[in-house]
């Protein structure tokens, strides 16, 4: 197989781009590094295309390795023909390769293998030849043998039929046809095991739809219902059509002796051997496709969450709500340093609201708090009402935000949190995390397993290795897009930087603690286990503010410093200007990028990136994102009326719509049909996590705590 050719066709890019990207990957370069600093080499392939290329490259190489193993196995058996070898070499999927290998795969004892041991294969061959005119019993009588364990003609015929059934089931062409027909025309059918059972799966108690039309979230729901033993799920294939096909392929001539036998063999082969295997395969394919879709959604949601803009320069009060154990508060300064922690008891059973307000007033006056970050877990609703009341009673201008606290409890009980705050209990740590994830979501959320962040669907039912790998890639891409401050970044953040492992990340922090702040990027080479290759991969993503070299505070890679300094010299700008806010207007002095790039001996795309960076050093891509909605008052669900227009934040995007926080504690659902006037295939075409949107209330169900919303505001 021409792997490079396949990748070129699949990705819709040039062969030269694929060749270059594969070479760079094989040389140990990371995806963020290739996407950012090797644009000329790859023709500016972005990180998304490079990730797809890398994933497919691994699959196709794995496929080639499997082909090599299979060809060697069949050759060892002395059964490899030129035609079979060609078919295996040209197969494009693992399923096709395994189909071709099936007849030669070492088997456990089967009815067919036992029949062969009893010497019945020649009888099977005679039946399949379809030439005999002798009655079947007469033919079979020749194979009756006490020694071989064939007691009578019927046993001989049954054994021959078993051999033929297995042989038919192993023909790759038949399996491919049946698989395709099952996928295209088959249905997935579910039923409830006990009609009296009440569950969230009621819509699937008597459900049937075409396999090819079953949406990913429904596949995952059916799988979960089956796993929880509430539903039975099966694939109903067009059996009559399949049997007609097999009869046509196997029965090549009408023979009154062999035709009835072969018809029985075909039915048995399909029902006993082929159908269960194809059903498993189709279910697995459906699940894989559904999981891939869910992982993509999870990844997009996670990216939006991580790339939320930081709220800088404000002292924040983190509020971890609770009932019996009290609400834990943590005051965090503008740099994320913890100034104070307190526990108050304004909620049931103690209801010490006035005491809580006095404590809040003291904290706000003492630390000049202007923003309260409230976790959205247990007792959040009650806490929000108290905060809104309190804000009205004080002269200071204070706002609050409801923050998704998913994962905060996981973090607060982790080894990492214990190391960071050894003297704090889990509640205090959680309050700190809730405050910090508002100040700098990326820096705080990288401390939490992405699976615990709560922006996916059915994540616990998926292939955990695949999920972790995909989400890890998302975090890596986000961290490298933003970059880190080498002197303040935690080990949790550093480990996602291109070329940096967990061990090296910890070594960087240790070096910092032992030697003080880094003053230039070259000092990274003094860090234990950080060699020249790791330095090449990581240096551009690590910034040093106020260091020896102003370029170290930018995302210009050290390999391009010579070109950057020459560019500044030609523009008559001192390097020190970079540290003061950038070399404004430098792009206006360039008339011919191509010519200049040749003179400076850098690529044209790299030159453009250098210019952008010199004009606005260490620009943060998160600044372009929408900031969270800050509130001073609270709404109650019972206050909502159909037709009301509200502003909200998209909290989660799933296959069938988006959940929006409108400030009433219960997120409302905007169904996919209400996201846009135009037809969209998926909600992500209209919204992303973190988007600030205007919505109209369609309906409120107080009993079920459901709010229906629409983003189609005007009537046509």
Predicted regions and their residues:
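Long, charged amphipathic helices and adjacent flexible linkers at domain junctions
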Residues: 281-299, 452-483, 597-642
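Accessory alpha-helical DNA-binding modules that contact the DNA backbone or grooves
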Residues: 30-31, 42, 46-147, 481-624, ...
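A glycine-rich phosphate-binding loop feature that marks nucleotide/adenosyl-phosphate handling sites
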Residues: 180-188, 319-323, 377-379, 403-410, ...
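Long, charge-rich intrinsically disordered scaffolds of nucleic-acid metabolism proteins
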Residues: 96, 401, 407, 412-482, ...
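Low-complexity, acidic/Ser/Thr- and charged residue-rich accessory regions of DNA metabolism proteins
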Residues: 139-153, 207, 245-270, 274, ...
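Duplex nucleic acid-engaging cores and interfaces of nucleic-acid transaction enzymes
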Residues: 49-52, 59, 63, 68-318, ...
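Short, ordered loop/turn segments at secondary-structure junctions
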Residues: 37-39, 128, 238, 321, ...
């Amino acid at each position: 197989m021409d792997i490079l050719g396949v990748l070129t066709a699949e990705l819709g890019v040039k062969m030269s781009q694929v060749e270059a990207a594969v070479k760079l990957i094989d040389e140990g370069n990371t995806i963020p590094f290739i996407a950012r600093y090797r644009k000329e080499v790859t023709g500016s392939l972005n990180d998304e295309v490079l990730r797809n290329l890398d994933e497919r490259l691994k699959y196709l190489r794995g496929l080639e390795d499997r082909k090599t193993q299979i060809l060697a196995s069949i050759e060892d058996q002395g059964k490899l023909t030129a035609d079979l070898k060609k078919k295996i070499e040209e197969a494009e999927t693992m399923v096709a390769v395994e189909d071709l290998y099936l007849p030669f795969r070492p088997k456990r004892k089967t009815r067919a293998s036992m029949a062969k041991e009893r010497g019945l294969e020649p009888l099977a061959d005679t039946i399949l030849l379809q030439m005999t005119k002798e009655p079947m019993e007469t033919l079979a009588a020749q194979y009756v043998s006490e020694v071989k364990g064939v007691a009578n003609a019927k046993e001989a015929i049954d054994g021959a039929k078993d051999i033929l059934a297995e042989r038919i089931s192993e023909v790759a062409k038949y399996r491919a046809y049946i698989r395709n027909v099952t996928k295209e025309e088959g249905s997935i059918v579910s039923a409830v095991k006990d009609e009296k059972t009440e569950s969230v799966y009621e819509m699937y108690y008597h459900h049937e739809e075409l396999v090819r039309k079953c949406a990913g979230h429904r596949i995952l729901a059916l799988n979960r219902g089956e796993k929880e033993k509430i539903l039975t799920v099966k694939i109903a294939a067009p059996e009559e059509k399949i049997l007609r096909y097999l009869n046509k392929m196997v029965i090549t001539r009408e023979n009154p002796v062999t035709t009835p036998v072969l018809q029985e063999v075909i039915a048995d082969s399909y029902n006993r051997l082929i159908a269960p295997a194809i059903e498993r395969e189709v279910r697995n394919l459906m699940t894989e496709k559904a999981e891939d879709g869910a992982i993509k959604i999870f990844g997009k949601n996670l990216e939006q969450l991580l790339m939320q803009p930081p709220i800088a320069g404000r002292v924040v009060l983190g509020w971890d709500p609770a009932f019996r154990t009290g609400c834990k508060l943590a005051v965090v300064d503008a740099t994320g340093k913890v100034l104070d922690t307190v526990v108050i008891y304004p909620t049931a059973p103690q209801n010490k609201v006035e005491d809580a307000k006095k404590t809040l007033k003291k904290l706000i006056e003492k630390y000049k708090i202007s923003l309260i970050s409230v976790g959205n877990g247990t007792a959040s609703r009650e806490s929000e009402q108290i905060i809104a009341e309190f804000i009205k009673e004080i002269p200071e201008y204070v706002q609050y935000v409801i923050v998704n606290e998913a994962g905060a409890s996981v973090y607060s009980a982790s080894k990492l949190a214990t190391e960071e705050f050894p003297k704090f209990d889990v509640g205090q740590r959680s309050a700190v995390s809730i405050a910090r994830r508002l100040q700098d979501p990326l820096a705080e959320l990288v401390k939490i397993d992405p699976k615990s962040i709560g922006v996916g669907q059915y994540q616990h039912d998926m292939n955990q290795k695949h999920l972790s790998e995909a989400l890890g890639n998302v975090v890596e891409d986000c961290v490298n897009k933003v970059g880190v401050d080498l002197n303040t970044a935690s080990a949790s953040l550093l480990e996602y930087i291109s070329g940096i492992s967990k061990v090296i990340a910890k070594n960087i922090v240790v070096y910092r603690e032992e030697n003080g702040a880094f003053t230039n990027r070259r000092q990274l080479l003094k860090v234990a286990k950080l060699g020249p290759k790791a330095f090449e991969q990581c240096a551009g993503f690590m910034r040093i503010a106020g260091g020896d070299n102003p370029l170290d505070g930018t995302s210009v890679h050290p390999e391009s410093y010579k070109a950057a300094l020459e560019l500044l010299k030609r523009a008559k700008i001192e390097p020190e200007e970079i540290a003061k806010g950038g070399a404004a207007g430098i792009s206006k002095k360039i008339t011919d990028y191509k010519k200049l790039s040749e003179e400076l001996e850098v690529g044209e795309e790299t030159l453009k990136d250098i210019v952008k960076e010199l004009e606005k050093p260490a620009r943060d891509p998160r600044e372009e994102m929408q900031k969270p909605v800050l509130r001073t008052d609270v709404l109650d669900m019972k206050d909502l009326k159909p037709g009301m227009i509200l502003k909200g934040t998209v909290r989660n995007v799933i296959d069938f719509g988006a959940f929006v926080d409108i400030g009433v504690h219960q997120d409302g659902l905007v169904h996919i049909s209400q996201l846009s006037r135009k037809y969209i295939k998926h909600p992500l075409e209209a919204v992303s996590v973190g988007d600030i949107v205007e919505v109209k209330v369609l309906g409120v169900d107080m009993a079920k705590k459901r709010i229906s919303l629409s983003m189609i505001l005007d009537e046509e």
